[in-house]
A protein has these predicted regions:
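N-terminal, positively charged/glycine-rich alpha-helical extensions of SAM-dependent methyltransferases
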Residues: 1-15
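Conserved alpha-helix/loop element of class I SAM-dependent methyltransferases that forms part
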Residues: 22-43
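A structural alpha-helix within SAM-dependent methyltransferase catalytic domains
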Residues: 32, 58-61, 126-130
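A generic alpha-to-beta junction signature in SAM-dependent methyltransferases
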Residues: 39, 64, 86, 133-135
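Class I SAM-dependent methyltransferase SAM/SAH-binding core
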Residues: 45-101
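A short acidic, Gly/Pro-enriched loop at the edge of an enzyme's catalytic core
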Residues: 99-110
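A short SAM/SAH-binding and catalytic strip from SAM-dependent methyltransferases
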Residues: 108-122
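A short glycine-rich, Lys/Arg-flanked "PGG" loop and its adjoining helix->strand segment in the class I
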Residues: 123-138
């Protein structure tokens, strides 16, 4: 899978993505519903990989109110879509390939919506990312 090409295509679509990605918005809303119904209600430290334009990110921030929300996307240009979130002290953006990056240890929740299909080795990703979770993390 050519990650450079994927990033370029998402960069070109970023201005219209939020308006066109209705299914992804529904997935984000359902994901948040499942999290709040079935998981720990307190997630102090959250990492979202593949944040894109931030639809799911905004839901996470509003509903879960974490102490820190670390957003990641393969496409560095997605930062331009997060300008309403980034001035907040609790939110940070790190661009890059989530399969290759290391993130803070003792994270309470590592989450994403509509992203894993772009990964070369999801099994390895989960094995590696497991070490970043807190003892009770998801």
């Amino acid at each position: 899978m050519d990650k450079r090409l994927i990033a370029e295509r998402f960069a070109r679509a970023r201005d219209t993505y939020s308006h066109e990605a209705r299914v992804q918005q529904q997935v984000a809303e359902k994901m948040l519903q499942l999290l709040t119904e079935r998981a720990s209600p307190l997630f102090r430290r959250i990492v979202e990989f593949g944040c894109g334009t931030g639809s799911y990110s905004r839901l996470l921030l509003h509903k879960l109110q974490p102490e820190s929300l670390l957003l990641n996307d393969l496409c560095p240009e997605m930062k331009e879509c997060l300008t309403d979130l980034l001035p907040q002290d609790t939110v940070q953006f790190i661009p890059g390939d989530a399969e290759a990056l290391d993130f803070p240890e003792k994270t309470d929740l590592i989450t994403s919506c509509s992203t894993l299909q772009w990964f070369n080795d999801p099994k390895e990703f989960f094995a590696r990312w497991h070490r970043f979770l807190s003892e009770d993390g998801y």
